[in-house]
Design a protein with these regions (language model features):
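Extracellular/periplasmic bilobed ligand-binding domains
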Residues: 182, 186
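Conserved small/polar residues in nucleotide/adenosyl-binding loops
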Residues: 193-194
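Catalytic glycan-binding domains that act on GlcNAc-containing polysaccharides
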Residues: 1-181
C-alpha cells in the first residue's frame, strides 16, 4: 500500500484509480499475456493493415532490450504487444515508464512499484486532473433523445445542463470546481451510450 500511496502523492492520481487499471489490465499481475513480444510484433509489422504502427512497436521493443531494462524472456504479453502489470505498449513504455523502486531499471513486468507508478504517470501525462472526477452518474430527462450520444461525442458540461441533465442524486452537474466548459460524453453502465 505504501507504493500506491507514494505514486498517488507524486502523480496526483487516486490509489483506487491506479488499482482499478491494474485489476482490469492484468487481474493484479496474474494475467499479463503469453505471447513473446518480438515474435508477435515482428509478425504484425509485416502483415495486416497496421504494419507501420506495429513496426514502431517492434523497434521500441528492440530498444527496451538494448537498454537492458528487461530481458527477452520477460517480454511476453498480448497478441498485440501490450505487456506488464498494466499492459503498456512498447512505445508508451519508452515515453512514460518510471523507475520507482530506484534499482536503475524501468521494469513493468517484475516490479509492481515501477508498474503502478508508471500507470499513474501515464494517466497524469494523458490529462488526469488531480481532484477532478473522471465521471459521475447522471439522470437524463425522459423527453431527451440520446440517440447518437456516446463518450466520444463530447459536449460542454454547460451544454448538458442546458439539455436538463443533473447528477443521479438530483444535484447540479457543475459543482466542486468543475468548469462549465469541460467536455464530457455519455456512457451507459456497460460502457455504451444509452
Amino acid at each position: 500500500h505504501d507504493v500506491l500511496s507514494r505514486a498517488s502523492a507524486v502523480y496526483g492520481v487516486p490509489v483506487e484509480t491506479i488499482v482499478a487499471v491494474w485489476g482490469v489490465e492484468s487481474n493484479f499481475g496474474d494475467i499479463s499475456g503469453k505471447y513473446p513480444l518480438l515474435q508477435a510484433l515482428g509478425t504484425l509489422s509485416c502483415e495486416g493493415r497496421r504494419q507501420s504502427y506495429f513496426r514502431g512497436e517492434f523497434f521500441a521493443t528492440m530498444r527496451i532490450l538494448q537498454r537492458g531494462d528487461l530481458r527477452e524472456d520477460q517480454l511476453k504479453g498480448s497478441w498485440a504487444g501490450a505487456f506488464g502489470h498494466t499492459q503498456f505498449m512498447p512505445t508508451t513504455y519508452e515515453e512514460l515508464a518510471i523507475d520507482f523502486d530506484g534499482d536503475g531499471r524501468r521494469d513493468l513486468v517484475s516490479s509492481t512499484s515501477d508498474a503502478l507508478a508508471s500507470t499513474a504517470n501515464f494517466l497524469k501525462k494523458r490529462g488526469w486532473q488531480t481532484g477532478q472526477p473522471w465521471g459521475f452518474e447522471v439522470t437524463i430527462p425522459a423527453d431527451m433523445s440520446i440517440s447518437g450520444e456516446s463518450r466520444r461525442n463530447k459536449k460542454s458540461l454547460s451544454s448538458w445542463v442546458d439539455r436538463g441533465l443533473v447528477r443521479a442524486d438530483g444535484s447540479p452537474i457543475i459543482q466542486g470546481g468543475l468548469s462549465g466548459s469541460l467536455q464530457a460524453g455519455l456512457m451507459s453502465q456497460i460502457g455504451r451510450a444509452h
